[in-house]
Design a protein with these regions (language model features):
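Short, solvent-exposed micro-motifs at the edges of structured domains
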Residues: 19, 36-37, 48-50, 171-177, ...
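Short, well-ordered loop/turn and helix-capping segments at boundaries between secondary-structure elements
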Residues: 125-129, 146, 150, 368-373
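Signature of Gram-negative outer-membrane beta-barrel scaffolds
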Residues: 1-130, 337-341
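Charge-dense, low-complexity polyampholytic segments
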Residues: 6, 61, 155-161, 534
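Short, solvent-exposed turn/loop segments enriched in Gly/Ser/Thr/Pro and often Arg
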Residues: 43-51, 55-56, 140-148, 225-228, ...
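Surface-exposed extracellular loop regions of Gram-negative outer-membrane beta-barrel proteins
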Residues: 134-171, 230-236, 390-397
Length: 538
C-alpha cells in the first residue's frame, strides 16, 4: 500500500502574462446620389500586434527551423527517444528577449511575424424605386477582420520547452515521492505551434434585400444574405503521416538487441492501439516529437441564406411578426482550437456543413391587448382592463453531428496516441433517410462502418452528416397592468416557457460506432417552467 509505479511533476507552474497592441480607425460618409438613392461607404483600418509574453517565455514550433539531422533517434518499437541523440529544442524558436542555449532566436523578435495592416471597405445603397416611401431595395458589401484571442498563445506558454519540463521518478512511495533520481521523460513530447506567417482572419458580407409596405400596417421583406470567411484559424497535427506512407518505409521492429527490421506497416494491417503505433515514431515528419498541434490560418467558410420577415400591426400595441431563414453554412474548420482534421495532409477533405448550421429557422412572436376597458374606470374596468397576451413560437432544424470510430487506423496515420485528430468511419448510406427517430436509435446506425482492412485510407464519411433532433418551442406570457396614477402602473406577469411540455431532444450519448450507446439520445432541453413577476412602471 502506498507504492507508486511512477511519480511525475512539471518543472514549473507557469502563468501566461501576455500582451498585444492594436490600432483601429474608421471613417464613414453618406452621399445622396439622387432624391431616391442614398449611398453610404466607409473604411476600417485594423492593425493587430504580435502577442508576446512579458517574461519572454513564449516559444513557438516553426517547421522551417526543424533540422532532421538534429532530431532524436527513436528506440525501435518502444517509440521513445534515445537519450543524448538529439536537440530537445529542434524546430523551436524563442523570443529574442530571453534567448536559450541550443534554441533558435526568433527572426521576428516574437513568436510570429508581424501581421499586415488590414483595410476593410464597406459600401451600401438604399433605393426607393417608386419614390413613394413604400418600397425599398437595399444592398451592401463589407470586409470585417477578426482579432484572434490569446488562447493558443497561452497553450504554448504552458506546454512547450524549454520553460516547461517534466521530471519522472519511478518507482516511488507515497510517504517519500522524491526518493530516487528524477529523470527527464524520454517519451516523445507534444508541441504547440502557430503559423509564423499568421494572417488576420476576415469575413466578407454581402446582402440584397427588398422591402415593401402594404397599406399602413403591414410590412414584408425578403432578402439574400451571404458571407465568405478567409484565413480562418484551425488546428492541424503536423506530425501525422500521409495515408499509406508507413507501408513503404522500413522500421526497427523491436527495442532489444539484436535489432530487427521490417515494414513499418504490413500489408492489410490495421493499427488498433496507441501501443501498436509507437513504431511509427521512427518515421514521423518531425521525429522525436509526438502530436504537433499547429494553429494555421488556412481554413475557409461560406454562408448563403434566404431571409423573409413579415410584420402586421393592429390596434393599440397588438402586432404579429414572422421571421423565416433558410440557410446553408459550409466550412473545412470544425473548431478553431479544439478539433483537428482526421488527415491534416488533406484538410480540404473536411469541407462539410458547419457545426452550428441549421437549414430552417422559423420564429413567430405576437402581442395582443384585449380591447376592453382600456381606461380602467370603475371596479369592472379595473378587473377586465389592461390584459395582454404575448408569446414566441419557434422551430428550427437540428445541427449536424460527426460519426466517429476509435482504435482504428488502417491508413497508418499515427493518430491513436496523443494526437487530437479523430478518425471517422466509411459512409454506406444516408443515416437521415427513413431514420427511426427513437431515443434508443435516432438515426440509421447501419450507415457507417470501419474502412475494410488493406484500403490504407481514412474513412470517407463527412463531418456533421448526422442530422440532430429539431426543436419546437411555445412560450407565452399573460400580463395584467393596473393603473395606479397617470404616470404609474403595476404589471403582474405569468410567464410560461415550453407551454405544452414538448420534449426536445438535443445531443447523442455517442456517435462512435464502437460505443455501446451509439446513436442514442441522452439529453433534452428544458421542460415546462413557469414564473410569476411584478413590476412597477413609472
Amino acid at each position: 500500500l502506498g507504492n507508486f509505479q511512477q511519480f511525475t511533476q512539471n518543472q514549473f507552474d507557469i502563468t501566461a502574462d501576455l500582451r498585444a497592441s492594436s490600432i483601429e480607425a474608421f471613417a464613414q460618409d453618406e452621399w445622396r446620389f439622387r432624391p431616391n438613392i442614398t449611398v453610404s461607404y466607409g473604411m476600417r483600418f485594423s492593425r493587430y500586434g504580435q502577442p508576446y509574453d512579458v517574461s519572454g517565455r513564449l516559444t513557438n514550433f516553426d517547421p522551417k527551423h526543424f533540422d532532421p539531422s538534429q532530431a532524436f533517434q527513436i528506440l525501435g518499437s518502444a517509440g521513445t527517444r534515445i537519450a543524448g541523440t538529439g536537440n530537445p529544442f529542434d524546430g523551436l524558436i524563442v523570443n529574442s528577449q530571453n534567448p536559450v542555449a541550443g534554441m533558435t532566436v526568433s527572426p521576428f523578435g516574437k513568436a510570429i511575424a508581424r501581421t499586415p495592416n488590414n483595410f476593410g471597405p464597406r459600401v451600401g445603397i438604399a433605393w426607393d424605386p417608386f419614390k413613394k416611401g413604400t418600397t425599398s431595395v437595399r444592398a451592401g458589401y463589407g470586409i470585417y477582420f477578426d482579432q484572434v484571442s490569446f488562447n493558443p498563445w497561452e497553450s504554448i506558454v504552458s506546454t512547450n520547452p524549454p520553460f516547461q519540463a517534466r521530471a519522472v521518478i519511478n518507482p516511488t512511495t507515497l510517504d517519500n515521492p522524491l526518493a530516487g533520481n528524477p529523470v527527464v521523460s524520454l517519451a516523445v513530447q507534444d508541441l504547440y505551434g502557430i503559423d509564423t506567417n499568421f494572417k488576420t482572419p476576415y469575413v466578407q458580407h454581402w446582402s440584397l434585400d427588398l422591402q415593401h409596405k402594404f397599406g399602413s400596417k403591414t410590412l414584408v421583406s425578403a432578402g439574400y444574405f451571404g458571407s465568405k470567411g478567409t484565413h480562418l484559424t484551425g488546428l492541424l497535427d503536423l506530425n501525422l503521416l500521409p495515408p499509406g506512407f508507413a507501408l513503404t518505409q522500413t522500421c526497427r521492429t523491436n527495442s532489444a538487441t539484436p535489432a530487427t527490421f521490417g515494414p513499418c506497416q504490413t500489408a492489410g494491417q490495421v493499427f488498433t492501439s496507441s501501443t501498436q503505433e509507437l513504431i511509427l515514431n521512427q518515421i514521423r515528419p518531425f521525429r522525436g516529437y509526438g502530436a504537433v498541434r499547429y494553429l494555421a490560418t488556412a481554413f475557409d467558410s461560406n454562408y448563403h441564406s434566404l431571409q423573409i420577415q413579415a410584420q402586421r400591426r393592429f390596434a393599440r400595441a397588438s402586432q404579429i411578426n414572422l421571421a423565416y431563414t433558410w440557410s446553408r453554412n459550409m466550412t473545412d474548420s470544425q473548431n478553431e482550437f479544439l478539433s483537428v482534421p482526421q488527415d491534416s495532409n488533406n484538410f480540404r477533405g473536411e469541407y462539410s456543413r458547419a457545426v452550428f448550421d441549421r437549414r430552417h429557422v422559423l420564429s413567430v412572436n405576437y402581442i395582443y391587448e384585449l380591447p376592453y376597458h382600456q381606461n380602467q374606470t370603475g371596479a369592472v374596468g379595473k378587473l377586465l382592463g389592461g390584459w395582454q397576451i404575448s408569446g414566441i413560437t419557434s422551430y428550427f432544424t437540428g445541427i449536424g453531428f460527426s460519426p466517429a470510430t476509435s482504435s482504428n487506423d488502417p491508413a497508418g496515420l499515427g493518430l491513436l496516441g496523443s494526437s487530437p485528430a479523430g478518425a471517422r468511419p466509411d459512409f454506406l448510406c444516408d443515416p437521415n433517410v427513413n431514420a427511426p427517430h427513437l431515443v434508443t436509435q435516432w438515426f440509421n446506425t447501419a450507415c457507417f462502418a470501419n474502412p475494410p482492412a488493406g484500403v490504407n485510407r481514412v474513412g470517407n464519411a463527412g463531418r456533421n452528416t448526422i442530422l440532430g433532433p429539431p426543436t419546437t418551442r411555445f412560450d407565452a406570457t399573460l400580463a395584467k397592468s393596473i393603473r395606479l396614477s397617470e404616470s404609474k402602473s403595476l404589471q403582474l406577469r405569468w410567464e410560461v416557457f415550453n407551454i405544452f411540455n414538448h420534449t426536445n431532444f438535443t445531443t447523442f450519448s455517442s456517435t462512435n460506432i464502437t460505443s455501446g450507446t451509439y446513436g442514442q439520445i441522452n439529453n433534452t432541453r428544458d421542460p415546462r417552467t413557469m414564473q410569476l413577476g411584478a413590476k412597477i412602471i413609472f
